[in-house]
A protein has these predicted regions:
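Beta/coil-rich, acidic/histidine-enriched accessory regions frequently appended to metallopeptidases
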Residues: 28-32, 36, 42, 46, ...
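Single-residue signature of alpha-solenoid repeat helices
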Residues: 53, 87, 121-124, 162-163, ...
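Short coil turns that delineate tetratricopeptide repeat
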Residues: 31, 65, 99, 133, ...
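Canonical tetratricopeptide repeat
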Residues: 73, 107, 147, 190, ...
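Residue-level recognition of tetratricopeptide repeat
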Residues: 42, 76, 110, 150, ...
Length: 906
């Protein structure tokens, strides 16, 4: 790029020096001059050498060159270096001279509009309309089609028709060899800009990609691709930003996007350096000063500096809505939704029709819990711009949420699908109520307004609600302060995670974000939430594991506490993200254990007043360097204490074949404490169905590292072998050990329910049912077994609740569940019992026990006590009789759902 730039500069110098007057008398000479030289000047302009462009354009003007583009490039270059008043004067002259040139009028309209000259911009509309009509249809070039399409959009045409009638035909023109026809590149760029304006970043990326096929080094296409990819693929977006700056080192857009990214990642010094580069070219650049205002707020909590920088940003155009829109959007990205919303209100005060601010304000209101104020704004944007993807998605989301039910208490508004509310709504209230009491008292916070909590069964709805776009895969919940959004525990995304632990985690964010007025770094908020999970229940949260041990002791993966935010921002994969959560929790644990909870509360209070986190920690503990040293020692000792007798070395290929049982066994003789070899041996013994040897090896594995409950743990291996030997008692014993250590051993809980059910151990059934429902409350068998256990313990109210949930989840034998409901209801609610019996008989007319109980209720006989233990000998309902039997069918018993043993834990 540098060599090409030097060549262009030499060429342009030749233009300025070698041709003081025309060398040829031909009338077409000036046109040839334009055709030869304008492409090179455009390239110089795109690379940010505005000073050279101004000189060349002034020379062209003195020569009387006919193309309007010399004048347009002249005033655009003047504006780019901050000479706005001169640029306006030149633009006015150009507007008077070129009233019929569509390309000139488009650039003039854009210049006047983005710099706040509303009357001049409006005046160009009439000129645009006349100029567009003046282009004969048969004579339209590819570039004419692009210009006509852009003019049509400005004049309010339907975007789909513009694509169909103008951009589409222009893009269908085929290149001739390596030569790109004039207008083809522009057609793809115009399509990309249109998609970007409608927030359809996928289509924008596709169009920018087509443009790059034609012009691989075009800065506009490279930067456009960066913007389109950045929200969904930061790594790819960063690559295109770097490519943009390789071609145009001082490209304003690329520099500013890099600065915004640096601000998002709390790299404030880097952001300042990037802004300095922009201002080295244009000291008055409005967006650069907008970012300086943001830095004043986030980095220094300096309100005076904020207002000064904002004032400079508005000095070019005092009513520019873009300034406060940008400020608010970035502040909201940093969870400062109140400040962000106020900024959008200022932007809308400048221009009530400024749609980006209106849409961003709708998002801010959603995150602040002001839902009723958000939807009308989103509708206004959708009405004004029917092709805006985000506005459309918000309309769809509103309809989805409208179908939700609300579970309300004085402290919470819980929104979720009505069918889900019936299943786990009460449990949500129980957990949140406990969390508010425990955590509120612990952190000395009284929240006097309801917290909004929403559960989404659809990942896309969760993403739109939480992020304003698709994405967020892998995230179970998000807290914005007074609003929590969560994936439903029944959603695919939730998988086998413990939703109760997640809910506790998210409500802890409510406490800490409220305490700090959302002025705290992500790492500290996450660290406290994970820490409080473990305080609530020992097997919640995160524990040391082999991966974390290796990262601490062998990979030097601990992030210095002073740079903890980068642990999240620079995480290279999902494991690095999880380790960031874990290390954040360890920092909090170390802080509380060493300095006390009161110091943590004091740090949060300082953050709420605008202090930076490192300053707050140092103020209430020790200097940051000393704190980092003590923490590193703390974390290292934890890692060293994890499996101290375990051999963690990696075997050489010649020492052990991981696929050969004999090779593994031989290696273990010399390395009896080797973690991976022991795991592999146990696994292969199971595959070989050598149950006794597998049990012995699993015991050795458990003894080696009893804390390990991850994939392929000794408890699971041993349980599989014991089950294969039909040793249910031994299997249950080892699974109980696993269940006590892991809050996500779903299959172990299911198996324990079955084993305890068969033994009539009702307390065991109830305990493991609660564990299982904390992961997936939509498992009908768990509710059924829980109901049977409560019935056996003469707890009819709890039994009814469980059986009702089982019935809602479409059991294989609904008649039998209804019979059990009736049996537990008949004492307190005979009418409800009667309804359930009638429904049971409607499905199974020959259900004798149901007939008997119905007669008992109808005749008003005294109700008899529930037989004990009813669950051990369930009363199955007969199958419904065929509708047109040829002969009297035999009575057929339907087995209780789940009688077939469930798979052992994997």
């Amino acid at each position: 790029m540098i060599q090409r730039l030097v060549a262009l500069l030499l060429f342009l110098s030749a233009i300025l020096i070698a041709f003081p007057s025309p060398l040829r008398a031909q009338a077409d000479y000036k046109r040839y001059f334009d055709e030869d030289n304008l492409p090179k000047v455009r390239e110089i302009f795109s690379q940010g050498r505005y000073d050279i462009v101004i000189q060349v354009c002034e020379y062209a003007d003195r020569r009387g060159q006919p193309s309007w583009e010399w004048r347009v490039l002249h005033f655009e270059a003047l504006a780019a270096i901050g000479r706005y008043e001169e640029a306006y004067d030149e633009a006015k002259k150009t507007a008077e001279r070129f009233r019929e040139d569509l390309g000139a009028l488009l650039r003039l309209h854009r210049f006047f509009k983005i710099h706040g000259y509303k009357e001049d911009a409006a005046a160009r509309l009439a000129d645009l309309n006349l100029a567009a009509k003046a282009v004969p249809k048969k004579e339209r070039t590819t570039l004419d089609l692009v210009h006509l399409g852009e003019a049509a959009l400005i004049l309010g045409a339907d975007p789909s028709k513009v694509i169909e009638q103008y951009f589409g035909p222009a893009k269908r023109v085929q290149p001739k060899g390596k030569e790109v026809p004039p207008g083809l590149l522009e057609a793809h760029l115009a399509s990309a800009r249109l998609a970007e304006a409608k927030e359809d970043l996928k289509k924008a990326a596709e169009s920018y990609g087509e443009a790059l096929k034609l012009a691989p080094t075009n800065p506009e296409a490279l930067f456009g691709m960066a913007k389109a990819l950045f929200p969904s693929d930061r790594e790819a977006g960063t690559t295109y930003l770097e490519k943009t700056r390789a071609e145009a080192p001082l490209h304003f857009g690329a520099l500013l996007l890099q600065a915004e990214s640096a601000i998002n990642f709390e790299q404030y010094e880097a952001a300042t350096e990037l802004l300095n580069l922009v201002e080295s070219v244009n000291p008055r650049h409005p967006e650069a000063h907008s970012y300086r205002a943001i830095l004043a707020e986030l980095e220094r909590n300096d309100h005076t500096a904020f207002e000064q920088a904002r004032g400079i940003a508005l000095s070019v155009w005092r009513d520019n809505p873009e300034i406060d829109y940008l400020i608010g959007r970035v502040l909201s990205r940093k969870y400062r939704y109140e400040e962000g919303a106020e900024a959008q209100k200022r932007a809308l005060a400048f221009d009530p029709g400024f749609l980006p601010a209106k849409l961003q304000l709708a998002l801010d209101y959603l995150r602040l819990g002001r839902v009723d104020a958000a939807w009308p704004l989103a509708k206004e944007v959708a009405a004004a711009d029917p092709y805006n993807v985000l506005a459309f998605n918000l309309e769809v989301l509103e309809k989805e949420i409208a179908s939700f039910t609300s579970v309300k208490t004085p402290d919470f508004i819980i929104r979720l699908p009505p069918e889900e509310a019936e299943i786990y709504g009460e449990r949500v209230v129980e957990i949140l109520t406990e969390a508010k009491k425990v955590l509120g008292e612990k952190y000395g916070l009284i929240i006097d307004h309801p917290t909004l909590v929403e559960f989404y069964p659809d990942q896309q709805d969760f993403a739109i609600r939480s992020f304003g776009s698709l994405g967020g895969d892998g995230l179970l919940g998000v807290c914005f302060g007074s609003v929590v959004t969560m994936n439903s525990p029944g959603s695919i995304t939730a998988a086998k995670s413990n939703w109760e632990a997640t809910l506790w985690h998210e409500y802890c964010h409510v406490i800490t974000l409220t305490a700090t007025k959302n002025k705290m770094p992500r790492w500290l908020s996450e660290g406290i939430s994970v820490y409080e999970e473990k305080q609530r229940q020992a097997n919640w949260g995160q524990e040391m594991n082999p991966d974390y041990r290796k990262m601490i002791l062998e990979e030097n993966a601990l992030t210095p506490v002073g740079d903890m935010s980068q642990a999240f921002f620079q995480a290279k994969d999902s494991m690095a993200v999880m380790f960031a959560y874990y290390q954040s929790m360890l920092v909090v644990e170390h802080l509380v254990e060493t300095y006390g909870l009161e110091k943590l509360r004091a740090i949060l209070a300082d953050l709420g007043e605008g202090a930076l986190v490192n300053d707050a920690i140092a103020r209430h503990t020790v200097p940051m360097e000393e704190f980092e040293t003590s923490f590193a020692l703390f974390a290292t000792k934890l890692a060293e204490a994890y499996g101290p007798g375990v051999d963690w070395t990696k075997p050489k290929p010649e020492e052990m074949n991981p696929r050969a049982l004999l090779s593994i066994a031989s290696y273990l003789k010399d390395h009896p404490n080797h973690f991976e070899a022991r795991r592999l041996l146990t696994e292969q013994l199971l595959e070989a169905k050598n149950w006794d040897a597998a049990i012995e090896s699993a015991d050795a594995f458990i003894t080696l590292l009893p804390e390990y409950t991850g994939q392929g743990n000794g408890y699971t291996f041993k349980a599989l072998a014991l089950r294969s030997k039909e040793d249910a008692v031994g299997e249950a014993t080892v699974l109980e050990l696993l269940a006590a250590k892991s809050a996500e051993a779903f299959q172990a809980y299911q198996r324990l329910i079955e084993v305890n059910f068969e033994k009539g151990n009702w307390d065991g059934v109830i305990t493991n049912a609660a564990r299982g429902l904390a992961i997936n409350p939509f498992t009908e068998r768990i509710h059924y077994c829980s109901g049977c256990a409560h019935e056996a313990k003469a707890q009819p109210a709890l039994a009814v609740r469980s059986f009702e949930n089982a019935l809602r989840l479409n059991p294989a034998n609904p008649s039998e569940v209804r019979f059990r409901l009736a049996r537990n209801l008949k004492g307190d609610d005979p009418a409800a019992a009667k309804r359930h019996l009638l429904d049971a008989l409607a499905d199974s007319p020959r259900y004798r026990e149901a007939h008997g109980m119905l007669i008992e209720i109808v005749d008003g006989r005294p109700t008899t006590p529930i037989a004990m233990p009813p669950a051990a000998s369930p009363v199955p309902a007969p199958a419904p009789a065929p509708s047109a039997p040829k002969e009297e069918p035999k009575e057929k018993e339907i087995p209780v759902p789940g009688d077939k043993p469930t798979p052992a834990p994997q």
